[in-house]
Amino acid sequence: MNGFAVIPSVTTTTTSGEPIAGDVARKQNLLELNREGLERFFENVLGEKRYRAHQVMKWIHHRYVSDFEQMTDVGKALRARLQACAEVRVPCVVFDKHSADGTHKWLLAMDTDSKNAIETVYIPDKGRGTLCVSSQIGCGLNCTFCSTATQGFNRNLTTAEIIGQVWVAARHLGNVPHQQRRLTNVVMMGMGEPLMNFDNVVRAMSVMRDDLGYGLSNKRVTLSTSGLVPMIDRLSTESDVSLAVSLHAPNDKLREQLVPLNKKYPIAELMASCERYLSVNRKRDSVTFEYTLMKGVNDKQEHAHELVKLMRQFDCAMQVKGAAKVNLIPFNPFPGTYYERSTEVDIRAFQKILLDAQILAMVRRTRGDDIDAACGQLKGQVVDRTRRQAEFRRTIEDRVGRDVAA
């Protein structure tokens, strides 16, 4: 278990993440706070100067120390007060798996009984290391090609549980911000829809980008969404991280089958919200559109030509060539799915149509599929509050029954 103890989660912050002054009966998890929240906690609860908060924040996020007694440049009296009213509570590592290609996956327990757990994935590459972080236990959406969707939904993760994934991974990797950086990028592409957990995700991303936290630049933190249009608009006013959109289809009819959220926010509205996002965040010059290729579903040449038209319209609206970038993702199978991965020939043919039209299109190399850590394969352990798990099991049983009868 790597020495990470699980303690029942308690809330000692307001909905905005501010510490509740004077509430020392319950310990404040300092991972729940960004720099501003930690400064307020030290001023209002501990009666200390703000620079003390900065000292502790560095101990937590630069040196991965969770025991106040080990924070040697913090006075003994202050350490004692911190022990009485605060803690650094991190997720518990249930197991970790290594892929043959270097990918690393952790199953992290969020509750004392380990019935709820999420998955976090580290993907090393030449000159970079990317951490794929989860935002929910399960997912409230029901995308038909995603393993997480089959698990149903339990709840949103807290800020501490989100940034705790980064803490666990960075500690394991021996990451040293500003020096020996093993973790160079974070993508909010794990379990869950990040924009359905807006406040906690935005607060966690602020710690990722803070020099007292993990020191990542805005462009190295990417949020991926299935297309919650109002929340994309809100994100544009509260953060300027890189934006990725799970598109997966070039027209509404097909996208509604793959991403049911499209019935509420169709492609035209989604693309308009992406235009507004770039208009507000002038530092960002592009949006990445993710497109999972499934055999015979969305990988035909006519789909590629439709996608070209959609991407060109976006570039034209932004008056920037290359404002739309396409990330082609070969489908990663999971038990019970009826989708199949497109052939390599079809994937390359699809990409060529985009490239010939001068649309930047990359094919994402599949990583970690031997440990079910590839895109779309994460599922964790979810105590489902919906009926989706049971419905998925019945679907599989019915399919197996038909196959046996045949």
UniProtKB/Swiss-Prot annotation:
Family: Belongs to the radical SAM superfamily. RlmN family.
PROSITE patterns: RADICAL_SAM
PANTHER family: 23S RRNA METHYLTRANSFERASE, RADICAL SAM CORE DOMAIN-CONTAINING PROTEIN
NCBIfam families for this protein: rRNA_mod_RlmN
Gene: rlmN
Active site residues per record: E119 (proton acceptor), C375 (s-methylcysteine intermediate)
Single annotated GO MF: tRNA binding
UniProt name for this protein: Dual-specificity RNA methyltransferase RlmN
Other comments on record: Reaction proceeds by a ping-pong mechanism involving intermediate methylation of a conserved cysteine residue.
Keyword Protein transport in record: no
Subcellular location: Cytoplasm
Cofactor detail note: Binds 1 [4Fe-4S] cluster. The cluster is coordinated with 3 cysteines and an exchangeable S-adenosyl-L-methionine.
Catalysis performed (reactions): adenosine(2503) in 23S rRNA + 2 reduced [2Fe-2S]-[ferredoxin] + 2 S-adenosyl-L-methionine = 2-methyladenosine(2503) in 23S rRNA + 5'-deoxyadenosine + L-methionine + 2 oxidized [2Fe-2S]-[ferredoxin] + S-adenosyl-L-homocysteine; adenosine(37) in tRNA + 2 reduced [2Fe-2S]-[ferredoxin] + 2 S-adenosyl-L-methionine = 2-methyladenosine(37) in tRNA + 5'-deoxyadenosine + L-methionine + 2 oxidized [2Fe-2S]-[ferredoxin] + S-adenosyl-L-homocysteine
Keyword annotations of the record: 4Fe-4S, Cytoplasm, Disulfide bond, Iron, Iron-sulfur, Metal-binding, Methyltransferase, rRNA processing, S-adenosyl-L-methionine, Transferase, tRNA processing
E.C. designation(s): 2.1.1.192
Gene3D superfamilies (alphabetical): 1.10.150.530, Aldolase class I
Domain of life where this protein originates: Bacteria
Intrachain S-S bonds: C132-C375
Binding positions (S-adenosyl-L-methionine): G192, E193, S224, S246, L247, H248, N332
GO cellular component: cytoplasm
Major enzyme class: transferase
